[in-house]
Amino acid sequence: MSFLLLGATLASLGPSWANPAQNAVVTKSVANVYSSPSEDADVVSQAIFGTNVVPLEERDDWVKVRTPDEYTGWMPLAALRRLGPGGRLYAAAGRVAQVESLTANLYREPDVTKHQPLLTVPFETRLEVTAEPADHEGRWLQVLLPDDHPAWIQRGDVTFDTKPLTIKQTIELAERFLGVTYLWGGTSSFGYDCSGFTQMLVRRRGVTMPRDADAQAAWKGLAPVKRNKPKPGDLLFFGSSPDHISHSGMYIGRGKFIHDTPHGHPGVQISRLADQPWARLLVACRRLK
């Protein structure tokens, strides 16, 4: 689907991206972030549609970027559009809708029957709203995409209320993702990995924490808690030792926690802390300060 490139051609990208004073925006539904400039490299993270990133280095058809959570890695040029020096960040001001459905379709017209969706975007995608017509029973919003093309989204798929969630609301949100597939390096509702899922839950509480589980456990924004006294909303960290953390989840009460795991039936699931291997591997418990 040529629309997925959203007008991002090499000719339009300019001679160099290696300028941290500039910004770029993701134009794919979800763009992989690689450990090195090759699709054969490990996928270490992702960035969703409309995410603003900072280009750090250019190499052939690749750009090293820094994402909003300070993660760095390599993305293909074709997944980005450069905003230019002093360019306006996408969906950073004005009337902005955020996708609240697990996924949402974008259309070229306010009609689901005439055309296939232009694009399917994940949970938390932010979109610039340009019109809220009263016709169509108020069901549709017109949005401006990062390539300056218009599109339409159904109002029921988005929210304008993005205030931080309570612990109870965060747990209710987490349970909406039960069964969503596990994806190594994933940070979207198309597939999370363990730390991508817990990072999203904490983000919805209004806090941006590091991307990886070991960095999360060491982060100063979390306070240590006794492992045998967790409270709902606390983060749990698992590994072979406190210095080798490889998994994370969120405690939801009554001896249970929710997490995204590749084990058993891979995906978001609820497990009991008393069960193995979790009881043996639990090495740290943390609480937002």
Each model region followed by its residue ranges:
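Bacterial N-terminal signal peptides
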Residues: M1-S12
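Boundary regions of SH3-family modules and the immediately adjacent low-complexity/disordered segments
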Residues: S16-Q22, K28, S38, T51-V54, ...
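Short, basic/aromatic beta-hairpin or loop at an interaction surface
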Residues: N23-V33, A93-Y107, V202-A217, I252
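Short alpha-helix capping/helix-loop boundary micro-motifs
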Residues: P37-D42, L106-Q116, A218-V225
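Loop/turn positions that initiate beta-strands
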Residues: G50, P122-L127, G233
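Aromatic- and glycine-rich peptidoglycan recognition patches
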Residues: V112-K114, T159, A223-R227, S246, ...
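Catalytic cysteine-centered active-site loop
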Residues: Y182-G196, M200-P232
